């Protein structure tokens, strides 16, 4: 569980973000926008493998509601929705340490993400799958062989 922002101070938070963010934050928003536009004509769900704090998941939900409608594409999020998981993969250990140092160990909870999506009126046609993605993704794919993916993040 993370500390959610004060939604009554959205304007202030927006200004703080743009005044303090690194250029890579803006490039990420633009990249997600371009990827979403490319997926518009492709049937299938938007799938995010690793929701973490929920920013890109919420961004895709808002894009969907801006460009289409809530039922145009299901958005599926896979995450532990708890502590950022450990890794045994040597190449990922340094990256994990950097992420934990910069962003903290704790992910957004499913309840918090659902609350945020409801406040933004983007909570329809969303599915959150909690657990170890190395297990939950194969299980989900086996139970949903009809799944088509238009955007994988």
Predicted regions span which residues?
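S-adenosylmethionine/decaboxylated-SAM
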Residues: 2-23, 40, 45-153
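Conserved alpha-helix/loop element of class I SAM-dependent methyltransferases that forms part
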Residues: 29-42
């Amino acid at each position: 569980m993370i500390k959610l922002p004060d939604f009554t101070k959205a304007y202030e938070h927006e200004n703080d973000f743009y005044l303090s963010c690194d250029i890579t934050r803006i490039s990420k928003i633009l990249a997600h926008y371009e990827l979403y536009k490319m997926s518009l004509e492709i049937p299938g769900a938007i799938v995010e493998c690793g929701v973490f704090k929920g920013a890109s998941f919420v961004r895709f939900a808002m894009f969907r509601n801006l460009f289409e409608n809530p039922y145009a594409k299901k958005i599926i999020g896979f995450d532990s929705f708890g502590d950022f998981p450990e890794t045994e993969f040597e190449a990922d250990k340094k990256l994990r340490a950097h992420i934990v140092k910069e962003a903290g160990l704790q992910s957004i909870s499913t309840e918090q993400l659902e609350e945020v999506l409801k406040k933004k009126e983007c909570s329809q046609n969303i599915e959150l799958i909690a657990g170890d993605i190395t297990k939950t993704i194969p299980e989900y794919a086996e139970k949903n062989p009809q799944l088509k993916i238009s955007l994988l993040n």
